[in-house]
Curated annotation (Swiss-Prot):
A single GO cellular-component term on record: intracellular membrane-bounded organelle
SUPFAM superfamilies linked to this entry: Cytochrome b5-like heme/steroid binding domain (SSF55856)
Subcellular location: Endoplasmic reticulum membrane; Microsome membrane; Mitochondrion
Annotated SMART domains: Cyt-b5
Entry keyword annotation includes Metal-binding: yes
Described function: Membrane bound hemoprotein which function as an electron carrier for several membrane bound oxygenases.
Top-rank taxon, per record: Eukaryota
Encoding gene, per UniProt annotation: oca8
Listed GO biological process terms: ergosterol biosynthetic process
Annotated organism of origin: Schizosaccharomyces pombe (strain 972 / ATCC 24843) (Fission yeast)
Main location: endoplasmic reticulum
UniProt protein name: Probable cytochrome b5 2
Lineage: Eukaryota, Fungi, Dikarya, Ascomycota, Taphrinomycotina
Any one Pfam family match given in the protein's UniProt record, by short name: Cyt-b5
Protein keywords: Electron transport, Endoplasmic reticulum, Heme, Iron, Membrane, Metal-binding, Microsome, Mitochondrion, Transmembrane, Transmembrane helix, Transport
InterPro entries associated with the record: Cyt_B5-like_heme/steroid-bd (IPR001199), Cyt_B5-like_heme/steroid_sf (IPR036400), Cyt_B5_heme-BS (IPR018506), Cytochrome_b5 (IPR050668)
Length: 129
């Protein structure tokens, strides 16, 4: 029997606490019934609803037991198309905070930090004599 394929459009529809799909390594999982049992709390999973959770899943370093448990919720393989919608992975569009840790710190931020450090030491040297 051929494995079921699930489109990106379908995954995007399942993004609520009661109806929650995630994708890990192009496999789709319906984890709606696992929320209460998740050791990291349900909010972690709700934040990943309807999106590609491969990065966060790998970053946590789940045990083999956790990986085996995930397979119990497997419902099919993700069908990606070039011209179709893409699954969000990070940022506000995906329901996250909007912070993307993969982006480098901008030079202006480094300049700000440098100015603050210099100001701190100047204050200590000249004001707090």
């Amino acid at each position: 029997m051929a494995e079921k394929t699930i489109t990106v459009e379908e995954v995007l529809k399942h993004n609520t606490r009661d109806d929650l799909y995630i994708v890990v390594k192009d496999k789709v999982y319906d984890i709606s019934k696992f929320l209460d049992a998740h050791p990291g709390g349900e909010e972690v999973l709700v934040d990943l609803a309807g999106r590609d959770a491969s990065g966060p899943f790998e970053d946590v370093g789940h045990s083999e037991d956790a990986q085996e448990l995930l397979e119990k919720f497997y419902i099919g393989n993700l069908l990606r198309t070039e011209d179709g919608p893409q699954l969000p992975t990070t940022g506000a569009a995906a329901g996250g905070s909007g912070y993307d840790s993969s982006q480098p710190v901008k030079p202006a931020m480094w300049l700000f930090v440098l100015v603050m450090v210099v100001a701190y030491f100047a204050f200590r040297k000249y004001v707090l004599k």
